[in-house]
């Protein structure tokens, strides 16, 4: 994912948590905050310490990052998104994880209609 689309600052993450809405399933939690029109959508990834040591947390984030990358052409513009990994994100096969992330983005209203 390009640098321009990454959400990295602590302040940005905190504002998404505080002011945004969230949807969740077994694999992940997605927090979404709408921005002004014309703002590019930015996405950040997180994994709590409860998930495991750094290697495990990084693996969970890599898997989620790839699932989001595959969805990226369909994601609407003008949002800040934070995706938080859950334990199931590590345990399930990647095609299932990709489907779960797509369901979350759909429920959050982040995907454009195809066609």
Curated annotation (Swiss-Prot):
<comment type="subunit">
    <text>Consists of a catalytic RNA component (M1 or rnpB) and a protein subunit.</text>
</comment>
<dbReference type="Pfam" id="PF00825">
    <property type="entry name" value="Ribonuclease_P"/>
</dbReference>
<keyword id="KW-0694">RNA-binding</keyword>
<comment type="similarity">
    <text>Belongs to the RnpA family.</text>
</comment>
<dbReference type="GO" id="GO:0030677">
    <property type="term" value="C:ribonuclease P complex"/>
</dbReference>
<dbReference type="GO" id="GO:0001682">
    <property type="term" value="P:tRNA 5'-leader removal"/>
</dbReference>
<dbReference type="InterPro" id="IPR020539">
    <property type="entry name" value="RNase_P_CS"/>
</dbReference>
<dbReference type="InterPro" id="IPR000100">
    <property type="entry name" value="RNase_P"/>
</dbReference>
<comment type="function">
    <text>RNaseP catalyzes the removal of the 5'-leader sequence from pre-tRNA to produce the mature 5'-terminus. It can also cleave other RNA substrates such as 4.5S RNA. The protein component plays an auxiliary but essential role in vivo by binding to the 5'-leader sequence and broadening the substrate specificity of the ribozyme.</text>
</comment>
<dbReference type="GO" id="GO:0042781">
    <property type="term" value="F:3'-tRNA processing endoribonuclease activity"/>
</dbReference>
<dbReference type="InterPro" id="IPR014721">
    <property type="entry name" value="Ribsml_uS5_D2-typ_fold_subgr"/>
</dbReference>
<keyword id="KW-0540">Nuclease</keyword>
<keyword id="KW-0255">Endonuclease</keyword>
<dbReference type="GO" id="GO:0004526">
    <property type="term" value="F:ribonuclease P activity"/>
</dbReference>
<protein>
    <recommendedName>
        <fullName>Ribonuclease P protein component</fullName>
        <ecNumber>3.1.26.5</ecNumber>
    </recommendedName>
</protein>
<dbReference type="InterPro" id="IPR020568">
    <property type="entry name" value="Ribosomal_Su5_D2-typ_SF"/>
</dbReference>
<keyword id="KW-0378">Hydrolase</keyword>
<keyword id="KW-0819">tRNA processing</keyword>
<dbReference type="GO" id="GO:0000049">
    <property type="term" value="F:tRNA binding"/>
</dbReference>
């Amino acid at each position: 994912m390009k640098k321009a689309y990454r959400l990295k600052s602590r302040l940005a993450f905190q504002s998404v948590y505080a002011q945004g809405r969230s949807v969740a399933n077994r694999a992940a939690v997605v927090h979404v905050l709408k921005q002004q029109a014309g703002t590019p959508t930015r996405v950040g990834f997180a994994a709590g310490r409860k998930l495991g040591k750094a290697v495990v947390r990084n693996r969970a984030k890599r898997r989620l990052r790839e699932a989001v990358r595959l969805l990226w052409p369909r994601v609407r513009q003008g949002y800040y998104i934070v995706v938080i990994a859950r334990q199931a994100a590590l345990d399930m096969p990647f095609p299932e994880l990709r489907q779960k992330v797509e369901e979350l983005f759909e429920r959050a209203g982040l995907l454009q209609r195809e066609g």
